[in-house]
Amino acid sequence: MQAARKRWPPSVAFWSPSPKHYVRVDRDSLRETRRLASSLRRNALAARVARVKAGMLRAELGNLSQLQIAHAHGVLADLARLEQATALHVAGDGRGSGNPPTSPGQGHPLSWGNSDSHGGGGGPGGGGGGELLITISPDGPTFSVKDDFRTEFISGLYTRQSQWLPFYGPWYAAMTDSAMQRRVFPKELKGNVNFQNSTSLKLMTGLLEVLASATEDFYTDGRNLSDVNAALCLLNGYYCLRTPAPLPSTYGELLADLDKKMEFLIADLKRDASNTDFSFAFSNPRQLETVAPLNRQGAYAPDFFGRHKMFAVMSDAGMFPNTKQTAASAQDPGARDIVYLITNAVFGENVPPFITYQLNLRTGLKALELLIVVYIVLENAHVQHNTVNRRLQLPALLGDQYKRPAAQRPQPQQPAAMFKKGFLFSFVVKNYMVPVLTRRPQTPASSLFPGAVLLALETADAASAGGGSGQTLGGHLINLSGKKYDQLFDVLNQKLTFRDVQGLIGAQTALRLTLERGLNLLLSKPSPLTSATEVISTQFGGGDDYDSLYFLILGCLPVTMAVV
């Protein structure tokens, strides 16, 4: 019997050598497969890059189309104004006018006349031809402005650089030196003038623009009001709540009697004896990174306004009937939100109540603080005819533009009126603030008074250098670090060098928070007027009330310096 063949298990049979088990490797096939895979990968990457480029091109073309549409709207508006001017010119010729009217833009930027006779420039709308007429000093000139007063005034100081250059005082001299020594600084702001004991035009206009936009809101929400408009609503609401005055229903009524309303509010703030100041409570450190509320509902933390003096005074008066502070003591259960009634009548239904959307409340309170600083500086100020100690000499700065016929010289004010308390502030309100706000209602408070912004920033810097209180052991502080300009230069670098939107928002937020802190420190001092006057005198060279007045509006006090 033949012995049975031994059968191996399948696992062993699989691994046992056999001519049937082999692997054939085709080198050409592998090379072709690798080539096809590489080609497919390159095509996929090229398609992705093409899609990204197409998206970027689509976005760029969209931006260009929006710019072209805006430019077309501007051209159409200019054509409409030209058509209206032509119609008026033809109508004037039809009535027997011998010569065509002269365009205001072809004359000198200064027009002369009695300041009180025209209320600061031909009414709130400004002069003809789209120009704005403003008057700053009772015995000074009336300025005809096309776009921005500071830019046009400063630009006119560099027309005779072969003879003299403007010098702006110790603060700006130190700022210029610090800017020229920095490694990271916009190249377009550096010039030879900065090394001639002066400051270049581009650097001055750039820095003044940063100061003027310190309180400008960069949010595009329709619920936002400019800080000045929010302050006007708060001021009018408080005045109407405490007096029999009717609620304003138009923007013109909102601007009426601003000097009286400011005086009324400041008088109540002086009578308030509570242990409060003008600061906000930042219980959440993240709130220091943004001006807008962290809460998406638009409200800050419950204790955010808890120690703010102005909010407490307004809240105790019943301006915010929905707050817990007034709910317990309100005598009228049906109390109205008087601020909302004003915003609804003047600005429309898109603006929610301030106590609900609290960004408007915060910016409005700080704008009121800035106006209070202006009021304090000008409350007892009066313009003297003696100019010996005066730094700002308009005849020397403006030259032939300052000359006018003797028949057009302004008549002097009555002494009793000029020495009246609050006269200069009332004059500035009627002849500067009201025309500018009527022409451009969205103007921020920092653009109206950049000098007040500088006062607050200097106060905050002195407090930081003095360990938080502004006091030093020697009684006199000399700051050689140059850190006071860091935040201003940071905004300039983000705008012109890095061009980073998020970085720019962060820099503007840091500057605004410093401004808020400085306003609180300045208004909390025993004598804010003394502190403000000292800053104007030591840092910017101010000599009298006339200099203080122009400093608040210009943000600088230039003098002529001969070129050697």
Curated annotation (Swiss-Prot):
Gene Ontology cellular-component annotations: host cell; host cell nucleus; viral capsid
Gly residues: compositionally biased ranges: 118-131
Region annotation (Interaction with major capsid protein/MCP) ranges: 1-45
Keyword Magnesium in record: no
Subcellular location: Virion; Host nucleus
HAMAP family found in the cross-reference section: HSV_CVC2 (MF_04025)
Protein family according to the UniProt entry: Belongs to the herpesviridae CVC2 protein family.
Domain of life: Viruses
Cystines in this chain: none
UniProt protein name: Capsid vertex component 2
